[in-house]
């Protein structure tokens, strides 16, 4: 008896469920399923009254031709060999289907559990089956499979679905073994595998196929690449050979189908519309670069290409790209998420950089944009590792978030700029230089919501020979007034002292702004605010070990004598000897000269 070893003999319930059929199950509720059974010879019809949990059972009842599933059954786990000759299943409940096979129905999603042991001359119709369970075809000799169009992809096929069946043991034909439209095995020794997909024929791969062992895979529909079990990797080389009409993004989508760890190194396309040269796909006239193979590291784009298409290099492992003078347009997301990209040399005639064109290129540290550039799209360099960018005269527009979340600290804008959009610069920017003030520069730099502590920064805005400091965040209720005051300062050459510090969103930023405005411009309102908050500022500076900054604050003479005594103890505790010396000097000297500095 194939009982569970954890079940003692006294826990076994033996029951004759119908004449000639005896089942054995545990009397423990959680183990109440049938783990063994005996069926007398000659019985052709068996009613399953309880859950049947007999995957490990080696018995076989070849006389049984029909199963009747009772209304209380929710789980049946058996091998085909238990009832090899069953040809009809009658279900009395909604969990299982009535039909030629054992099919589990989960809210309309149908999983093939068993086809039983079909002969070589029998046809298996998968009909409206949605998925195939492990060992569903074990012991089956039939190679005649039809239907199954509802089986959408490899995720619907368990790894051992076809194990120990004729479908798995059949000889390779053209390097593959098929079960209807499902490819169940591939000859890994073949130099290339040509998949028999076409305009009207969808192919699904079994989930156990290891694509990393395939040297070269040829497909004929773009959608076929999505059938690859990416968890098992990708073939080294993939060829899209098709006469179908395709969008350029379809080609790029095939070339760049990947995971974070695995990808198709070499891609080629054979098509009436596209051609491939040295691992890069172009339109047939060669004027648009459509898709680069993900394995290429250094690319010199040939002269004659006018456009770098959408997603042409997206997610590629390219390290350097040289763009020829013939290129005038870099399209949306053309280089997005190229995490290895370090160098881009732009041609002299690039006019536009599309939205998200270089987004998330984290290793791209510096770019020099040519004088031909007229527009930089939304988020074009978003989350790029840029530390410096050179913008040339002739640039007209910088899009939304174009340089957001970069590492750029200083940027010079040309006089030709006519359109600066929302949040186009990173919070890391400390200084922006522009020949003359434009109101929209504030839109590009100042945000109207509460900042994170790490983003609560001050920026120096240099317009011609005048400058002031602006907070990167203002309250929504005062942001318009603050921007008007910034504009008024630059519009009136006679106005020498700005008062922008009060518009800062947080108290911390107000303190920093007031500090700068008092030291650089002698603002009396800033001075009054500093006197009230000097002790708080000094303690904050000391908490973050900014000794030099604390010294500069002390030297303004705005820290009270009582506060200085408290700071002296703190300086002693923190081991700040230079600060300690200045505090002692200030305590003994009422004259404390001001000193220029920057935060």
Go through the PLM ranges and name each one.
Residues 561-568, 594-596:
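Boundary/linker segments of alpha-helical solenoid repeat arrays
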Residues 552-553, 583:
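Conserved hydrophobic site in ankyrin repeats
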């Amino acid at each position: 008896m194939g009982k569970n070893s954890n079940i003692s003999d006294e826990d076994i319930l033996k029951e004759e469920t119908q004449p000639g059929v005896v089942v054995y199950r545990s009397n423990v509720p959680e183990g109440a399923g049938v783990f063994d059974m005996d069926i007398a010879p000659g019985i052709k019809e068996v009613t399953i009254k309880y859950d049947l949990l007999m995957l490990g059972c080696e018995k076989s009842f070849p006389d049984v031709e029909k199963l009747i599933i009772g209304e209380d059954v929710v789980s049946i786990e058996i091998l085909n060999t238990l009832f090899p000759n069953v040809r009809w299943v009658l279900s009395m409940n909604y969990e299982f289907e009535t039909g030629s096979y054992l099919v589990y129905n989960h809210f309309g999603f149908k999983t093939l559990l068993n086809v039983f042991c079909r002969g070589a001359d029998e046809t298996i119709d998968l009909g409206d089956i949605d998925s195939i369970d492990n060992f569903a075809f074990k012991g089956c000799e039939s190679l005649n499979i039809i239907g199954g169009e509802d089986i959408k992809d490899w995720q619907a096929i368990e790894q051992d679905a076809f194990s120990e069946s004729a479908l798995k043991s059949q000889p390779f034909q053209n390097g593959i073994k098929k079960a209807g439209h499902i490819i169940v095995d591939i000859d890994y020794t073949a130099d290339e595998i040509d998949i028999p997909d076409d305009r009207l024929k969808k192919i699904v791969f079994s989930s156990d196929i290891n694509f990393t062992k395939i040297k070269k895979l040829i497909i004929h529909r773009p959608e076929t690449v999505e059938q690859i079990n990416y968890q098992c990797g990708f073939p080294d080389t993939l060829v899209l050979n098709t006469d179908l009409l395709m969008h350029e993004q379809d080609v790029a989508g095939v070339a760049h189908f990947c995971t974070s760890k695995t990808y198709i190194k070499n891609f080629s396309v054979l098509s009436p519309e596209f051609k491939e040269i040295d691992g890069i796909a172009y339109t047939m006239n060669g004027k648009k670069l459509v898709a680069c193979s993900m394995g290429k590291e250094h690319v010199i784009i040939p002269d004659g290409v006018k456009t770098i298409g959408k997603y042409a290099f997206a997610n590629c492992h390219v390290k350097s790209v040289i763009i020829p003078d013939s290129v005038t347009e870099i399209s949306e997301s053309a280089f997005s998420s190229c995490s290895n990209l370090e160098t881009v040399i732009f041609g002299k005639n690039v006019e536009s950089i599309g939205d998200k064109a270089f987004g998330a290129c984290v290793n791209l540290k510096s770019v020099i944009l040519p004088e031909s550039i007229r527009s930089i799209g939304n988020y074009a360099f978003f989350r790029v590792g840029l530390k410096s960018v050179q913008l040339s005269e002739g640039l007209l527009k910088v899009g939304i978030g174009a340089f957001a979340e970069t590492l750029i600290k200083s940027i010079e804008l040309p006089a030709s700029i006519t359109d600066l959009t929302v949040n186009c610069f990173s919070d890391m920017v400390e200084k922006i230089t522009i020949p003359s003030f434009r109101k929209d520069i504030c839109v590009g730099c100042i945000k109207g919501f509460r900042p994170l502590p790490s983003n609560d920064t001050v920026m120096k805005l240099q317009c011609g020979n005048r400058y002031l400091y602006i907070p990167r965040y203002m309250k929504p209720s005062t942001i318009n007034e603050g921007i008007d005051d910034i504009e008024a300062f630059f519009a009136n050459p006679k106005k020498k002292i700005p008062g922008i510090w009060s518009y800062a969103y947080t108290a911390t930023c107000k303190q920093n702004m007031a500090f700068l405005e008092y030291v650089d411009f002698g603002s009396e309102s800033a001075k009054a605010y500093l006197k009230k908050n000097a002790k708080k500022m000094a303690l904050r500076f000391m908490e973050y070990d900014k000794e030099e900054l604390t010294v500069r604050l002390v030297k303004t003479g705005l820290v009270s004598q009582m506060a200085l005594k408290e700071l002296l103890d703190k300086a002693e505790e923190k081991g700040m000897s230079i600060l300690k010396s200045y505090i002692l000097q200030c305590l003994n000297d009422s004259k404390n000269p001001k000193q220029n500095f920057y935060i």
